[in-house]
Amino acid sequence: MNKKNREVTSSWFTNLRDLVCAEFEKIEEEYAKAKGLKPGKFVRSSWERDGGGGGVMSVMKGEVFEKVGVNISTVFGEFSKAFRAEIPGAELDGKFFATGISLVAHLKSPLIPAMHFNTRYIETSKNWFGGGGDLTPFYPEEDETAKFHAAFKEACDKYDSGYYPKFKKQCDEYFYLKHRKEPRGVGGIFYDYLNSGNFEQDFSFTQDVGKALLSVYPEIVRNKLFLPWTDEQKEYQLIRRGRYVEFNLLYDRGTKFGLMTDGNVEAILMSLPPEVKWA
């Protein structure tokens, strides 16, 4: 395992966390000031993992963001024997190191899309990056979807013209509810097991994926910040959120990885919306 690689990746995820939290709090302040309300603020709580490592969970419940969670973690140790076969390079001794950031935003307004994003770096006897971002609007708009995809395409095209079509396809396939036979949202990009043989390039790409998210999602939120919405639209949002819950509990790799490595349960389930309905 490479100590320097572990340190620089972990440091970046912490830095990205700070940038995201600052920008989301700024949006809260803009809205609250205009409406004469008290803006939400992130509340942080640290946790430690018995087997090694830990993380920091940042959660904000505000006037714009009904619930947004940003979790960073750096954990290490040994996979259980039952889980080793599922992780590349873990078959022999099961040792691993994993660091990353995960964030999910659920907005009060049903007109503003929910968003999920994560990037991570993992070492076993092998090493790789993974992650991506995806958008879940309740009332999709073509221009908004195109803008979201364009930000990630620009990040991808800097490195390989084949990245975006490949990672978009992987996102569409991954965020699909098989039991419902429907996609979770309008996609984005999703990549895993990325190791081109050039650590610096793969790390730079992963950083640019984070910067792409910061460049586009706050703009999407601000564009609809003051649009009025109805009780019927809110009800529809709550029902559609049920799909989000179903995916995260049935299919999400991050949820499974966290639970199988004795991660913090509250941090792992941080992505679940604060209120949801099933019809």
From Swiss-Prot:
Q: Where is this region: Important for dimerization?
A: 244-279
Q: Which residues bind substrate?
A: S102, N118, T119, R120
Task: Write down the chemical reaction(s) this protein catalyses.
Answer: coproporphyrinogen III + O2 + 2 H(+) = protoporphyrinogen IX + 2 CO2 + 2 H2O
Q: Where in the cell is it found?
A: Cytoplasm
Catalytic residues (positions): H116 (proton donor)
> Could you describe the subunit structure of this protein?
Homodimer.
Q: What does this protein do?
A: Involved in the heme biosynthesis. Catalyzes the aerobic oxidative decarboxylation of propionate groups of rings A and B of coproporphyrinogen-III to yield the vinyl groups in protoporphyrinogen-IX.
**This chain belongs to which protein, by name?**
Oxygen-dependent coproporphyrinogen-III oxidase
| UniProt source species | Rickettsia bellii (strain OSU 85-389)
Lineage per the UniProt record: Bacteria, Pseudomonadati, Pseudomonadota, Alphaproteobacteria, Rickettsiales
Q: Which gene encodes it?
A: hemF
